[in-house]
Each structure stands twice: as C-alpha cells, then as structure tokens.
Amino acid sequence: MKVLVTGGMGYIGSHTCVQMIEAGMEPIIVDNLCNAKLEVLNRIEALTGKQPAFHQGDVRDEAFLDAVFAQHDIQAVIHFAGLKAVGESVAKPLEYYDNNVDGSLVLARSMRKAGVKSIVFSSSATVYGDPEIVPITEDSPTGATTNPYGRSKYMVEQCLSDLFHAENDWSITLLRYFNPVGAHPSGCMGEDPQGIPNNLMPFIAQVAVGRREKLAVFGSDYPTPDGTGVRDYIHVMDLADGHIAALKTVGETSGLHIYNLGTGKGSSVLEMVDAFATACGKPVPYELCPRRPGDIAECWASTEKAERELGWKATRTVAEMTADTWNWQSKNPNGYSPA
C-alpha cells in the first residue's frame, strides 16, 4: 500500500514512516523541511533497510502535489504537515492559518483530482479547548479552542467533515493526539525542534544534556495536585502504531472516523521532570514561571473508542517515554545536526 505522508520528515511523521515500512506499507514523503532535516531519511533507512521516496515541497503548492500524485500510485494520505507550537501560534496567527488550513484545503483538492479519497488527519486534543470534564471523549464539545494552533486544527476538521457530507465516498479519519513524547528505542530517531523547544520533553532533554541551563515551568498555580499543568503524554511509537491501525481498519471504509490517541492517564509537568531525572540519573534544574497564554490546566483522553474500533491501545509507560527520550538525546546531543 502506497501512502503519501505529508510532513513525513517531522517528529511524528518520521516515526510513523518507520512503523509503516515495518508493517509492509510504502510511505511517499512530502515535506518542505521548515521544521525537519534531510538526515531523517538516512535514519529511516538505517532502521528499516529502505529509504522512502522523498519530494521536497510545500502542501500549499497544488501543482507540486499534483505532480507527486501523478508519479506514484497512491492509495491513501496521512497528513502531518503543519505548524504546531501553541505559543508561536498566538504571536503568528496568520502563518498558522495559512500553513495549517490553506495547506489542508490544497491537499484535499489535489487528492480529489487524483482520485485518492482516504485521508488520516493529524489533529489535536487542542480542539477540545479547556475541557469541563476529563477524561475527554470523542463527543466532548469542540471548537472553544484557546489558541490559533488549536483553532487551525478545528477548522481543518470542520472542512474535512463538510467534504465528507458533500462527497460521502471519502474515508476521513481525524486522530486527536494528546501530548506526543519519547523517541525510537534505538536512539537513532527522536524529536529535534528548531531553535528553543516549545514542548516539554525536548526542553527537559536539552537541559539534561547541557544545551540549556534550566527548564521554564509555565504555571504553578493551576488547580492540579502540584499546581503544574496535567497532560496525557503518549509515546511517539504508540502514536505511530495508531496511524497504522487507522489505515488498516477504517482507512478503506468510507465515513468520518474520529479517535482520541492518548494513554487515558494524566501526568503533571513536575511528575515528568522527576521521571526524566530518574531516567538520566541526575536532577533537572527548573524554575517556576507565569502561565503561558493559551495553555489549560489539565487534559487527558478517554481511549475506549480507539481500543474498541481500531484494536489499538497505548502500551508504553512514562518511564519508557523518558528513558527513550534520554537515549536519543544523549546519543544525539545536537539532534540531527553534526556536532
């Protein structure tokens, strides 16, 4: 099965490509490399023995996408491409709507022309906004998002939903991720953010490896057990397996399919700091800072629907998430860049 993977050089996309190859699928990667490095292709080949086809370009470039579809017999699409930092989205909303919303619309148009009507969309738990009740189920209210990143994901969900209701031969799967962390257990691949990390785990890892002085913990006065934000952290390998489960089960069935991908358990920022200190064998210095705009107090998933319909469940523990992150960061202190 040939699958176009937009953003396939990024953190989640690259790990998913490895798992796809292991499952006998053939990923065709499209990425503009705005938040990724070419070295990822070599790492995928090192892990799988195969280097996937790669086309450098932007999903907002319709002629480019049309040419990729014409060159390959693609049966489905996994759409990861997009900007993903909550804080940056507050400062740069237009860039987020342009990349995430317009890019998705251009992709859908190109798919329709090519007769490819199966898409798995990389959505986010941010579409739920600040939830009144946790755990969050797939029918929890959406749309009251607290930042432009979340709004862009919600808008794309609405666009794809409208597309399905207009043309119900599409298979559209919306995967709402919670908080992806971890790395390939080999230490060969992991998260390599450009510039200052926006997400907790790579920031902790860079502090532990000596690239940064200390971790900034944003918000210590939330109504949570230790005052710091609580999130559902999911290992990127479990997340990758969730995409393959979606392609295999509902990817060939027309419909609008929506699933949470999380563990069903919440962990606080300070709990993750402690777990990482255990993994790397030394304390991680941090300071408590004011809340960030757009952040919420707590958020974790109800995972029963994915377990029931996809036969998928996250199995890796917080200890594995932190150990694999440290293994990646200690082996690759500068990420994919040479020292």
Regions found by a protein language model. Name each.
Residues 1-183:
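N-terminal Rossmann-like NAD(P)+-binding domain of SDR-like oxidoreductases, especially those catalyzing
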Residues 57, 69, 96, 192-196, ...:
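Pocket-edge positions in alpha/beta enzyme catalytic cores
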Residues 97, 146-154, 190, 194-198, ...:
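Short-chain dehydrogenase/reductase
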Residues 175, 186, 215-217:
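Oxidoreductase cofactor-interface core, primarily capturing Rossmann-like NAD(P)-dependent enzymes
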Residues 182-184, 221-222:
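Short, basic/glycine-rich phosphate-binding loops at helix/coil junctions
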Residues 184-197, 204-207, 213:
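Hydrophobic, Gly/Ser/Ala-rich alpha-helical and linker tracts in large acyl-processing enzymes
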Residues 200-339:
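C-terminal substrate-binding subdomain of Rossmann-fold SDR/epimerase-dehydratase oxidoreductases
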